[in-house]
Amino acid sequence: MEAFIQKKPLEAHNPKKQLWLFALSVLLILLNILSNNIYPFLAPDAPVNGQIAVVAGWMPDKALAKTAERLAGSDYQLILTSGGELEYGSLFSEYPNYAELAKATLQIDGVDSAAVIAVPAQQTVKAGEIAASAVAVRTWLAENRPEVTRFDLFAPGPQARRARLIFHRTLGDSFEIGVISIPLENVPTRKWGRSGEGLRVVGGELLALLHDAVPF
């Protein structure tokens, strides 16, 4: 009976399989290194210390509160809040756009109301909030402060680099635009890849930046 039982041969050495395992390990290490550097790349903190600050009014309330903290210790003479029509809830809000809503929020957070001016855009977030806001700011500066050639843009977390890119593209090389990234409460700055919201926001902003930076 034993003569008919065949023993399974030991698995032979497979160099191709080991090579694939090594390549996979290297790939995982590279992805981990890359993920640790994606957020800082998307969310730079590089102000030019101009006299004017431009605030992305579509930031969440807690991000606007952090913005107010940064503004409190600054030398900005004027603060422009930007943003288009509210994406939802406008029927129940006394503020028709993010610019005016952000202005009111900053005032509640302690920012001097005399230093804040709302500069509303004409489009919603889905229709191109950043570009429309850049156009509105450019128009306001041309009409009211034509001598201004540099300012700092306060933008939400990983959207900061893309926001500066769009503002620079809209206003042109005659403007020097700094950027200050305001952390978002629900998006970890380091281990963002471990949360669904982090993956959605950071991954989405990375793709959006590539789309806006590379002409098609």
Provide a role label for each language-model segment.
Residues 39-194:
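A structural signal for short, hydrophobic/glycine-enriched beta-strand patches
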Residues 10-13, 85, 89, 202, ...:
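Amphipathic, soluble alpha/beta structural segments
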Residues 1-16:
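N-terminal Lys/Arg-rich, disordered targeting/topogenic segments
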Residues 14-16, 28, 201:
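Residue-level recognition of hydrophobic positions within alpha-helical transmembrane segments
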Residues 18-36:
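Hydrophobic membrane-insertion alpha-helices, especially the h-region
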